[in-house]
From Swiss-Prot:
GO terms for cellular component: cytoplasm; nucleus. The gene is SOFL2. Involved in cytokinin-mediated development. Together with SOFL2, triggers the endogenous content of specific bioactive cytokinins derived from the biosynthetic intermediates trans-zeatin riboside monophosphate (tZRMP) and N(6)-(Delta(2)-isopentenyl)adenosine monophosphate (iPRMP) such as N-glucosides trans-zeatin 7-glucoside (tZ7G), cis-zeatin 7-glucoside (cZ7G) and N(6)-(Delta(2)-isopentenyl)adenine 7-glucoside (iP7G). InterPro entries: SOFL. The keyword Nucleus applies. GO terms for biological process: cytokinin biosynthetic process; cytokinin metabolic process; cytokinin-activated signaling pathway. This is Protein SOB FIVE-LIKE 2. Residues 78-93 have a biased composition (Polar residues).
Length: 147
């Protein structure tokens, strides 16, 4: 597809440039012949074409050809976003997902507590470990004070 625009002298054309790219660039740079205006109506939005002089008349010539394309908008370049449902519906299994998530969290907490309990199965071992730690720390303090 050949681009209708001319930028200065000769136009460089990329081999990967498509018709869509040229269409979008032409529209972006203001090289289009009409613009699309979305008007809000009671039942949603409608598309209205505005010509270059901005008066809203789509047909400037005086011929009376009855063409059905003048009455309908050209939606070929319109986004497919209108095909999605208008209301968002949450997944049906939201409650089940939340319950499973809570169950998994409780299971992880229980496993962690069990590991701690296994590590110190006897309260005597736990208190003995604390006493060793205190003794070692106190002896380090004494040694550093004597120097």
């Amino acid at each position: 597809m050949e681009s209708p625009r001319i930028h200065g002298g000769a136009e460089e054309k990329s081999s990967c440039e498509s018709g869509w790219t040229m269409y979008i660039e032409d529209t972006f740079h203001g090289n289009h012949h009409s613009e699309v205006v979305y008007e809000e109506e009671d039942d949603g939005f409608s598309v209205k074409e505005v010509d270059d002089d901005g008066d809203g008349d789509e047909d400037d010539d005086d011929d009376d050809d009855d063409d059905s394309s003048n009455n309908e908008s050209d939606d070929s370049m319109t986004s497919d976003a209108s095909s999605w449902p208008s209301t968002h519906q949450p997944p049906r299994s939201t409650k089940n997902h939340a319950a499973a998530k809570n169950s998994n969290a409780k299971q992880v907490n229980n496993q962690t507590e069990n590991r701690v309990r296994d590590r110190f199965s006897d309260e005597g071992e736990e208190s003995e470990l604390k006493a060793r730690t205190r003794t070692t720390a106190a002896s380090r303090v004494k040694v550093s004070k004597t120097k």
